[in-house]
């Protein structure tokens, strides 16, 4: 478009029409920042719908792998990457290419600090790198989970300060503006029962035009979009979803501890309760929460609530219950060893499964890492096995530096501790070959043996 031949009054409308046309004709360029467990699947989904997609990441290893047609995520085969490359998908670490995009979607990590406060470093650094390269009429969408207000209070000021542009507010029809929305990711790794396209996409725009742009863009790859009034409402929606899960998991974890004292099988109780066709949704106990959302998100809201002189007692209590579960696991293991006249100090323990949930290659916030650290600190000789991880290196909290052990000679271990119930494990054989099993996931359901301690 030649700006010399377009009046100031009509330029924004022309930009809006151009964006809509480029989306509808699949000529829009889409940039996705963060080629991880959220960003890469999203980029591939856009590519499958024949958008021209560029993936951005600061990790050169990811860029090299993608450029070579490879995949570093278990559930994404290399053939999907190769097919995307055939449709024009590219990967880069150079933010100078941001200006070529019609829409830029930010999918970067938002962990907690050691003091359980929001760590928005990745969002801030991304925004600072993005700002000098954005252009008028672009749509910028944040997908990273954070507290209500992050989009407007953190992202937008950095983008405005680092560029000569302003985020469109109000009617949004003015020169020199870009458009901003928040749309929370809803990835559920390892869940193949719901197609990604069938997961409704929640959208909150900074103004009506931004919301419309985002709805049109996401509506081209998702079967349903759900618009809410503001980015903060969309941010709160994501937190509600995950806090709902966190609180209910904490409830069933606490009930499990009570059931153990009462000599009741909590797993049997849950299976019976879920036969009720209304008013009950089954949640299951475990060794603790893991992943990039459920253990983290409640504390984002709790932190923000304090700015409003509000204490989220219920949420924080649920977080404390879930955070205590690795300690319960270790205590149960110690008791099981003591019953066999053994001590944890010097015991050989094999941790079976270290991913945060079954059948995924993701270690983030996994309770297994805390359990391993606790066992080591009490003198246990700890090994692990997980089909997805040949090595555990330095993480955000722990530097375990362990290589995967073999499943041969399980009888050499004083205890096999089941933390993650991967589907590929032959649990009957594992029980048969082991001296003692401590099962935190009910993975040995249906197997009767005095070797098994369920906790």
Spans of features found by a protein language model:
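Structural/interface elements that position substrates and couple domains in central-metabolism enzymes
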Residues: 2-455
């Amino acid at each position: 478009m030649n700006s010399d031949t377009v009046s100031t009054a009509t330029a924004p409308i022309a930009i809006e029409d151009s964006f809509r046309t480029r989306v509808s004709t699949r000529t829009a360029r889409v940039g996705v920042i963060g080629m991880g467990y959220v960003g890469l699947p999203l980029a591939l989904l856009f590519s499958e719908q024949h958008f021209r997609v560029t993936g951005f990441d600061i990790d050169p290893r990811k860029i090299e792998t993608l450029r070579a047609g490879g995949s570093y995520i278990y559930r994404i085969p290399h053939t999907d990457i190769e097919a995307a490359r055939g449709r024009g998908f590219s990967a880069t670490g150079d933010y100078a290419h941001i200006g070529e995009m019609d829409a830029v979607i930010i999918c970067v990590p938002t962990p907690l600090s050691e003091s359980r406060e929001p760590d928005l470093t990745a969002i801030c650094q991304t925004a600072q790198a993005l700002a000098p390269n954005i252009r008028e009429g672009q749509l910028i969408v944040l997908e990273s989970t954070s507290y209500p207000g992050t989009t407007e209070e953190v992202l937008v000021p950095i983008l405005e300060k680092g560029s000569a542009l302003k985020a469109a507010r109000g009617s949004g029809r003015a020169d020199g503006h870009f458009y901003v929305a928040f749309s929370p990711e809803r990835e559920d790794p390892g869940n193949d029962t719901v197609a990604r396209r069938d997961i409704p996409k929640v959208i909150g725009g900074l103004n009506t035009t931004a919301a419309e742009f985002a709805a049109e863009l996401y509506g081209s790859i998702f079967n349903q979009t759900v618009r809410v009034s503001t980015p903060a409402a969309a941010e709160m929606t994501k937190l509600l979803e995950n806090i709902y899960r966190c609180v209910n998991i904490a409830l069933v974890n606490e009930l499990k501890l009570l059931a153990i004292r009462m000599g009741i099988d909590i797993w049997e109780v849950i299976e019976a309760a879920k036969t009720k066709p209304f008013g009950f949704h089954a949640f299951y106990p475990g060794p603790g929460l893991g992943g990039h959302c459920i253990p983290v998100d409640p504390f984002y809201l709790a932190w923000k609530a304090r700015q409003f002189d509000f204490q989220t007692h219920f949420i924080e209590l649920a977080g404390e219950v879930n955070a205590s579960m690795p300690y319960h696991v270790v205590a149960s293991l110690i008791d099981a060893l003591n019953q066999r006249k053994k001590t944890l100090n010097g015991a050989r323990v094999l941790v079976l499964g270290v991913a945060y949930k079954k059948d995924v290659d993701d270690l983030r916030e996994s309770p297994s890492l805390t359990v391993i650290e606790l066992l080591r600190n009490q003198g246990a000789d700890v090994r692990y096995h997980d089909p997805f991880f040949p090595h555990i290196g330095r993480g955000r909290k722990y530097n375990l530096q362990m290589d995967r052990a073999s499943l041969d000679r399980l009888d050499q271990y004083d205890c096999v501790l089941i933390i993650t119930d991967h589907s590929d494990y032959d649990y009957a054989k594992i029980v048969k070959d082991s001296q003692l099993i401590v099962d935190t996931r009910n993975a040995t359901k249906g197997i009767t043996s005095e070797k098994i301690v369920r906790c």
